[in-house]
């Protein structure tokens, strides 16, 4: 099947598959291949994937993926800005994807191509998301009273030894407040994470408050929170769709 934006070839010969794949890569099209193939990777490690029926996708931005018939993630992949090519060696068809920094190479041997296609896709829209921790952070920065009256945020994604604090702020008395955000029910691991952040600051000062913010919390997590002298705020993440550009403290300084 051929049209102005796509070309498809079923059970192509090696030369037909090569020409179609190279044409798709040259045109910066979305290349989709169903084939029996094997793969080898060399870079920060080494791996070998024996022959099997798989889906191969080469995207216009250089992304290269080999999918099996199970699981969400590809079994082999190369990130955007990798360089892909097809070539024939000793009568076999190969695909190669190379990343320069760090130096990585993924080679796929096509043993039998069942379907080769490419599509001149055009997609300029960003994903609209809602309900993540970043959305909660934006909402709290814009409406700090949701934490409590007098709360003043001073930093986001504040780096400490044990990770990144979602929001760092001060209460109306000037005491430091560490805010840990969870967009779903918070568990014991969230409490432990918050405690690590608070402990780092309590080594140098007194009056540090840790607040876990989530739409709900497990019974065990609430017990641990109270035992550690930490606090909980029940706040639902915003549900309105928005672009992936977040609100920063610069908007309010």
UniProtKB/Swiss-Prot annotation:
One of its GO terms (cellular component) is cytoplasm. Its EC number is 3.1.-.-. Keywords: Cytoplasm, DNA-binding, Endonuclease, Hydrolase, Nuclease. Its main location: cytoplasm. InterPro entries: Endonuclease_NucS, NucS_C, NucS_N, NucS_N_sf, tRNA_endonuc-like_dom_sf. One of its GO terms (molecular function) is DNA binding. It is found in: Cytoplasm. It is an enzyme of class 3 (hydrolase). Belongs to the NucS endonuclease family. HAMAP family: NucS. PANTHER family: ENDONUCLEASE NUCS (PTHR38814:SF1). Cleaves both 3' and 5' ssDNA extremities of branched DNA structures. This is Endonuclease NucS. It comes from Methanothermobacter thermautotrophicus (strain ATCC 29096 / DSM 1053 / JCM 10044 / NBRC 100330 / Delta H) (Methanobacterium thermoautotrophicum).
């Amino acid at each position: 099947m051929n049209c102005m934006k796509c070309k498809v070839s079923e059970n192509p010969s090696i030369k037909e598959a090569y020409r179609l794949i190279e044409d798709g890569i040259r045109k910066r099209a979305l290349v989709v291949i169903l084939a029996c193939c094997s793969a080898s990777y060399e870079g920060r490690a080494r791996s070998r994937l024996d022959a099997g029926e798989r889906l191969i996708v080469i995207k216009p931005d250089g992304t290269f993926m080999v999918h099996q018939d199970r699981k969400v993630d590809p079994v082999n992949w190369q990130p955007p800005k990798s360089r892909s090519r097809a070539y024939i060696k000793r009568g076999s068809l190969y695909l190669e994807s190379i990343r320069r920094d760090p130096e990585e190479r993924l080679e796929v041997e096509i043993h039998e191509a069942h379907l080769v296609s490419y599509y001149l896709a055009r997609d300029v829209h960003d994903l609209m998301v809602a309900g993540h921790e970043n959305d909660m952070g934006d909402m709290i920065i814009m409406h700090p009273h949701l934490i409590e009256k007098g709360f003043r945020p001073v930093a986001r994604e504040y780096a400490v030894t044990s990770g990144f604090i979602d929001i760092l702020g001060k209460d109306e008395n000037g005491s430091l407040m560490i805010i840990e955000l969870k967009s779903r029910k918070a568990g014991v691991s969230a409490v432990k994470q918050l405690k690590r952040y608070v402990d780092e600051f309590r080594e140098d000062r007194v009056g540090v408050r840790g607040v876990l913010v989530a739409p709900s919390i497990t019974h065990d997590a609430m017990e641990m929170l109270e035992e550690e002298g930490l606090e909980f705020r029940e706040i639902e993440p915003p549900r309105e769709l928005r672009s992936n550009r977040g609100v920063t403290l610069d908007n309010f300084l």
